[in-house]
Amino acid sequence: MTTYHDELKQLDHTYLWHPFTQMQEWMGEEPCIISRGDGNYLIDVHGRKYLDGVSSLWCNVHGHRKKELDDAIREQLEKIAHSTLLGLSHVSGIQLAQKLVEIAPKGLKRVFYSDSGATAVEIALKMAVQYWQLKGESKRTQIASLAESYHGDTVGSMSLGYSETFHRFHKSLLFPVLRITPPHVFRYYQRLNETAALDAAIQEAEQKLDENKSTLAALVMEPLMQGAAGMWAQPVGYLHALSDICRRHGILFILDEVATGFGRTGKMFASEHAAITPNILCLAKGITGGYLPLAATLSTEEIYSAFLGEYNEYKTFFHGHTYTGNPLGCAVAIANLDLFKQESLLEKMQPRIAYLARRLREDFLPLAHVSDVRQWGYMIGIELVQDKANRKNYVPEQRIGHKVILEARKQSVLIRPLGDIIILMPPLGIGDGELATLLDVTYDCIRAVAGD
């Protein structure tokens, strides 16, 4: 007898093309088909519950079916589902812009909406380059970014964060970028301690940015944690230093907080750890609590003012998408931000962040095939290698990371790897018992797949 799951599986295999998924492999595995959510759990068509260990790709904040967020969407839906911001405005878009400016690093005054992290970054790039054109510095078109970073999958964001694995087929579309080596001891500075690596990385950044300051429009970076690049952590001093270097050399400083924003690092924005304000800030993922696609690019008044002029001066920022600033997304984003305050969410996270750090250090790091653990708040990367002593990676074809997450699924926990780096990114509202379960299952699955 054909079940509902079997029917959906057949339809999926017939019609659907999944993102970042090798479809031949996908069609050879039994799919997990989600039908609903409840709290920090996803529920499949069989009724089986899974702990959402990666916040539905790093965006869920308070859990699924959060009453206040559900209600906000219903209330907005009774008014209007969508109205454009091109030549018009709308209530929830205005109100959210005010709230974002109020909580953002001091000095960010203007909000430009879009619908994904990649588009938020793309907008920042276009703003930065056009800003310098409008200021009469036409040579300043070059962009700098951190080596092996990841900023999205549009052409501009791919150029910023080039990955040979992801983007090799699109090289001809990409523009050249000045690469700055970040202070990752495990990746780049194996012969140095953390202090020496930080000094070396800052020295390189100073030199490269100084040498290219006359042509550089901006430096773009993810603060404190390079997420999809492999959960590469940075010390606060690095963020502070790059902000200072850009300020001294007159280079716009753009922070991509698509992943790190909205509480992920333990503060509302990662830039708060260094008490700095970028010229442009990119936000997405957690902005709606993980409910609807929405993104925002915030700028200083200085940047915004450069675009003001008579129509025939062509200073307009010619960018905008159909669903930019969708009212439903803005309404649920407002409710999401209200919940941060009402539930003292950031304060409640602090002991859990300490618990995560202790478990990672005491339980995971001693494992024979765990070479490194990297954490900022609720952003965690556990790197698996074949030979820990010699830092020898597994052969990619072994799919060790993939095998770990399949094993976790058998134990009703959903996580997702980046190669052989196991990513944990739980909802910010996760409870103590659920957090312990996430760690226990991940630990057991690493041991089961890779050995002790």
Language model features with spans:
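Conserved N-terminal phosphate-binding loop of PLP-dependent enzymes in the Aspartate aminotransferase
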Residues: 2-452
